């Protein structure tokens, strides 16, 4: 049985103003060994260290956030374009229709993938806030998370409608519909936020050391418990753990698709596709990857899997990814 915790109980502490959420040392990917098997598919040069990536369906482009900035990489053989931004982004999300949003200190950037133009959006009253995560709800509203553990739901491009501050740090945000979901690595927890953004709905412990979070089109949440060696699958209405499956070799990178959940194994430079439809993950396919395969993205229209190296070893493109 999985215990459900309502985060409003946090407010019942004797001194809530001074309370700091208890934390553990955050987990992270394994330091990958040198590649000994040729990566599947094609490897495109990308000397920067990839941090996050998203595929934009409208422009058929992969947008990669690297240690040195932002790169737009068209599908096929199109030349990549580097995009200049005024300050270092921390995370990104997209709408699938040609816009990508990148969190940064004091606000976020809106990138037009077609033109490469960048607009800077300053969140009112939060010029000094270190925003660490960003997601977009189905109603178009953006949600931002911060290094000091707050979640901000915007009512316009720059205005905050509501906020809640109960986390050690907001390490990742995703959405299912108008529900935002927070991953806090220090608390190794996942938490759903009320649609109005003013409070938490439910929270669950996520293994022994959760590191990454993804959402899929079937309404599921995928979590890599890297320290515990597991793939965790949650439902969101209400938040409930549906599946927990052992995955060895430091699972880290995640992307959910219509048919498979893809997980990268950073200790062995492998990516594995799991079918979740039966109620327990079933491995369907695995591919050798580039070194340090920390970042995954997927093009559903062409079944193309992208594996981006965070050690500067390129971006791997696997066409028609999946079981044969």
Task: Indicate where each model-derived feature is located.
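Predominantly soluble domains enriched in secretory-pathway, periplasmic, or organellar proteins
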Residues: 8, 12-324
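Sec-dependent N-terminal signal peptides
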Residues: 1-5
């Amino acid at each position: 049985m999985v215990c459900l915790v309502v985060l409003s109980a946090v407010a019942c502490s004797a001194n809530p103003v001074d309370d700091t959420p208890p934390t553990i040392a955050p987990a992270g990917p394994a330091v990958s060994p040198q590649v000994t098997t040729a990566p599947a598919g094609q490897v495109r040069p990308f000397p920067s260290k990839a941090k996050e990536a998203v595929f934009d369906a409208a422009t058929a482009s992969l947008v990669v956030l690297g240690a040195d900035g932002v790169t737009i990489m068209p599908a096929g053989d199109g030349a990549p374009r580097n995009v200049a931004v005024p300050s270092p982004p921390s995370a990104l999300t997209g709408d699938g229709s040609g816009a990508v949003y990148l969190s940064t200190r004091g606000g976020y950037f809106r990138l037009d993938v077609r033109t490469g133009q960048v607009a800077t959006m300053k969140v009112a009253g939060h010029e000094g806030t270190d925003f660490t995560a960003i997601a977009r709800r189905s109603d178009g509203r953006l949600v931002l998370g911060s290094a000091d553990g707050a979640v901000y739901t915007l009512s316009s491009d720059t205005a905050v409608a509501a906020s809640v501050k109960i986390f050690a740090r907001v390490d990742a945000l995703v959405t299912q519909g108008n529900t935002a979901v927070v991953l806090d690595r220090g608390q190794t927890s996942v938490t759903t936020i009320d649609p109005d953004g003013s409070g938490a709905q439910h929270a669950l412990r996520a293994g022994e050391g959760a590191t990454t979070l993804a959402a899929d089109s079937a309404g599921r949440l995928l979590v890599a418990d890297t320290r515990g060696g597991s793939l965790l699958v949650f439902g969101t209405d209400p938040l409930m753990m549906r599946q927990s499956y052992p995955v060895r070799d430091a699972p880290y990178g995640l992307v959910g698709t219509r048919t498979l959940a893809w997980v990268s194994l950073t200790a062995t430079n492998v990516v594995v596709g799991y079918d979740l439809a039966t109620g327990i993950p079933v491995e369907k396919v695995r591919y050798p990857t580039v070194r340090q395969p920390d970042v995954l993205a997927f093009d559903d229209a062409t079944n193309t899997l992208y594996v981006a190296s965070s050690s500067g070893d390129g971006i791997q493109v696997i066409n028609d990814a999946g079981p044969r």
